[in-house]
């Protein structure tokens, strides 16, 4: 199975950096929307492919712009929500990285499906989970992905994507290895 990680486009919390980092649920900017529309030329999502998306406004908007009408839709998982990289318990989570609750998602995106990963990942989020707990839950998500058909696309955040890349194939990554706005990276034969 191959996984392509996609980083969301430019979002509202970066407009007045760093003053807007505690903004709740920032969406994509016009620039971010254009980045994702441009990304569609490089990403070919087929109807049978699996899309897993972080429960944040900017990633859900990214998926809406990436998907074609033929695709069945994306599934939401807190296991691809924002996660700090590198991990440091001294840093407080930022407001922009707060995920939607299941109640909020059911109101805002009633047609979306969820991957059942247990309540702990929704309530605690993966942002500051210790490495062992994150790895255990991430392995469960990857096992679920392996059972799906087609290619898997994960629409997420720089820190989260880097944590998964470290877990899967790469080591010694730094913030310099972040994909950046609307960036993507494919891991083969997961």
Question: Which sequence ranges carry the predicted segments?
Answer:
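Glycine-rich phosphate-binding loop signature in dinucleotide/nucleotide-binding domains
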Residues: 44-47, 144-150
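Generic beta-sheet signal
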Residues: 3, 148-158
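Short, well-ordered beta-to-alpha junction loops that form the rim of enzyme active sites
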Residues: 9, 53-57, 78-79, 119, ...
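Phosphate-handling substructures
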Residues: 22-27, 70-137
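Domain-level recognition of soluble alpha/beta enzyme cores
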Residues: 169-190
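A short, acidic, amphipathic alpha-helical segment used as a generic capping/interface helix at domain edges
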Residues: 133-148
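Active-site-proximal alpha-helix that buttresses catalytic centers in soluble enzyme cores
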Residues: 2, 6-75, 108, 182
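Short aromatic-enriched loop/helix-cap "lid" or pocket-rim segments at secondary-structure transitions
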Residues: 14-19, 86-90, 167
